[in-house]
Amino acid sequence: DVKKSLEEFRPELSGLTFQTKLGSMLSKSDRMLKLGAELCPLFGFTTTETIKPFGRAVYLAKADLVTQMVTEMTSLQGIIGREYALRSGEDEVVATAIGEQYKTIPQSEIGVALALTDRLDSLVGLFSAGLAPTGTKDPFALRRAAIGVVQPLLEHDLDFDLNEAIAETAKLQPIEVSDGTRAKVLEFIEGRLRVVLRERGNAHDVVDAILGQA
């Protein structure tokens, strides 16, 4: 395993299923790559200095999922990717983003953008596949994914158009995404935002005012 570069693992993602209707992890990775390019303006990435490393981080983000170490211990996902990226000679900003993509609140701007791209693809795709959380059932951890969209935006005080981001994500899904589904995803994320704001001590009327402006 160690002799291979991170990029060399990527094609093997075709053998790893993300979800039956949504294809393999390679399909998801390809979608994320296209989505990332569309979302660059929303992330404020307008120059080669940010667009290029962000694209590279998205391209390599999931490659470590097929390494032996991650296969044997899934909690190492991202961590192993970062190590492989550094050993493969990737830029440190790329490796850092790969390493923190699964954290609720990544610290680097490229890490945040990578995490949001991944989580939006999962939320929109899985909602469209009829796999939205119900009651206590949330097999794809979509509540955590939604909090993972909200928390970085709040923590880094980012001005990010969620509605537009969801619309761009919907265009790239391999199955149809209805307007109703898009609205449900937005409502679901806003619901998590409401929870997070209240946990931070914001009064109900303040939360309503913030969400009213969103």
Where on the chain are the PLM-derived regions?
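Amphipathic alpha-helical "coupling" segments that flank catalytic cores
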Residues: 1-214
